[in-house]
Structures are given as C-alpha cells and as structure tokens.
C-alpha cells in the first residue's frame, strides 16, 4: 500500500473504527463532522485519494459506499499509539503526534482504548494519575459531568474532571493546589478529545 499523508491515515483509521464499532462505514457527512471539514465534499476528495492508493473501494450510489480493501485490513497491529506534544489546531490522532506504539490490548479497558497520552504534571495525583503515567483514552466527542476527560481548551490539551453548568464548563483538578479551569462556551473554544479509561504506570514499560 502506498504511503499515506497524516490526514489520509486519520480518515482510514476512522473508517476502520466505525466499521468495528457499528458494523458499517461512516457517511461523508459523518467524516466531515468528526474531522472538522467544512463540507462532505472535502471528505469525498480524501476518500478518492485513499481509493487511488488502494486502501478502500468507493461504491457509487450509497452514502455509506466505502469498502476496505484486503490490503488495508491486513496491516500489522502496531498497538496503541502514544500521543506526544499536540500541535495547535491539529487533530490529536494526527500521525505527526504519535511518538511510538505500545503493544497493549485495547480491550483491556472498558470502553476500549483508542490511544495513550503521557501524563504531564501532578494535577490529577489524588486519583492515582501521576506524572509520566500513560493514560488510556477512549475517543469521544461529548462528556458527562464527573467523567475524567482529555479536553482541548483553545490550543491547550489537559486531563481533568468534567463539569458543565449552563453555558460554562469547569475542568477540575484532583489536587488541591490547582484551581478549576473555567471555560465560557460563549467566547472560548472547548472540545472533548477522549474519556480516560485506565492508567498504565510508566515504570511498567521501561
């Protein structure tokens, strides 16, 4: 299979994950919404590029007419990607953010993990999330109050406990030395990148 751009790799992974989770591929509109494209036409152009590279087949006449090729489904299992520094404005699972892969079974966690994030700082130490740990994260777009989430506030990515009150979101640390991060949704950008589903002690992987 010909090399993919970071965006193409991200779309291919989204298609695979959608088929695994729901039994069917996403629509163009769903791809556009989940990856922040302005229109379904932008998703269509990326799908055509994936088809040219032999990753998928496009089936005309249906909104879910995407079929994985045998070549794309036989890629070796590299394990869970470890996400390093996240560039401003870029999707968290973009290829350039992946430091390495760990041979971890995603099914160890409930719900299953989609990626690992290295913990920086001690703001969540009171619940056992420590500096240098690997946080297992399940990709979601919406969170419920009380959940531990990976959130992007403007261009900063943080791990905190989620609480929404009206048009404001509070991201709470689990360390009394840190004040909550208050986000006014009327004039600040907030996106949920994932749900924390487990912790791997850093020393376990040395």
From Swiss-Prot:
Keywords: Autocatalytic cleavage, DNA damage, DNA repair, DNA replication, DNA-binding, Hydrolase, Repressor, SOS response, Transcription, Transcription regulation. Pfam families: LexA_DNA_bind, Peptidase_S24. InterPro entries: LexA, LexA-like, LexA/Signal_pep-like_sf, LexA_DNA-bd_dom, LexA_repressor, Peptidase_S24_LexA, Peptidase_S24_S26A/B/C, WH-like_DNA-bd_sf. One of its GO terms (biological process) is DNA replication. Disulfide bonds: none annotated. Coiled coil: none annotated. Residues 28-48 bind DNA. It is an enzyme of class 3 (hydrolase). One of its GO terms (molecular function) is DNA binding. Its EC number is 3.4.21.88. The record marks 88-89 as: Cleavage. It catalyses: Hydrolysis of Ala-|-Gly bond in repressor LexA. The active site is at 123 (for autocatalytic cleavage activity), 160 (for autocatalytic cleavage activity). HAMAP family: LexA. Belongs to the peptidase S24 family. Homodimer. Represses a number of genes involved in the response to DNA damage (SOS response), including recA and lexA. In the presence of single-stranded DNA, RecA interacts with LexA causing an autocatalytic cleavage which disrupts the DNA-binding part of LexA, leading to derepression of the SOS regulon and eventually DNA repair. This is LexA repressor. It comes from Shewanella pealeana (strain ATCC 700345 / ANG-SQ1).
């Amino acid at each position: 299979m010909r090399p993919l751009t970071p965006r193409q790799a991200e779309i291919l992974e989204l298609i695979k994950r959608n088929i695994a989770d729901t039994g069917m591929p996403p629509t163009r509109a769903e791809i556009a919404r989940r990856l922040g494209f302005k229109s379904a036409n932008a998703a269509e152009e990326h799908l055509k590029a994936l088809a040219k590279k032999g990753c998928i087949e496009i089936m005309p006449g249906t909104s879910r007419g995407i079929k994985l090729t045998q070549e794309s489904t036989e890629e070796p299992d590299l394990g869970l990607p470890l996400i390093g520094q996240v560039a401003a404005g870029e999707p968290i699972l973009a290829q350039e953010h992946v430091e390495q892969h760990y041979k971890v079974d995603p099914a160890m966690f409930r719900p299953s993990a989609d990626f690992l994030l290295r913990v920086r700082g001690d703001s969540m130490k009171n619940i056992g999330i420590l500096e240098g740990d690997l946080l297992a994260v399940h990709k979601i777009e919406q969170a419920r109050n009380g959940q531990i989430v990976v959130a992007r506030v403007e261009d900063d990515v943080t791990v905190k406990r989620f609480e929404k009150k009206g048009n404001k979101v509070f991201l709470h640390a689990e360390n009394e030395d840190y004040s909550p991060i208050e986000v006014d949704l009327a004039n600040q950008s907030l996106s949920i990148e994932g749900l924390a589903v487990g912790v791997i002690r850093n020393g376990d992987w040395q």
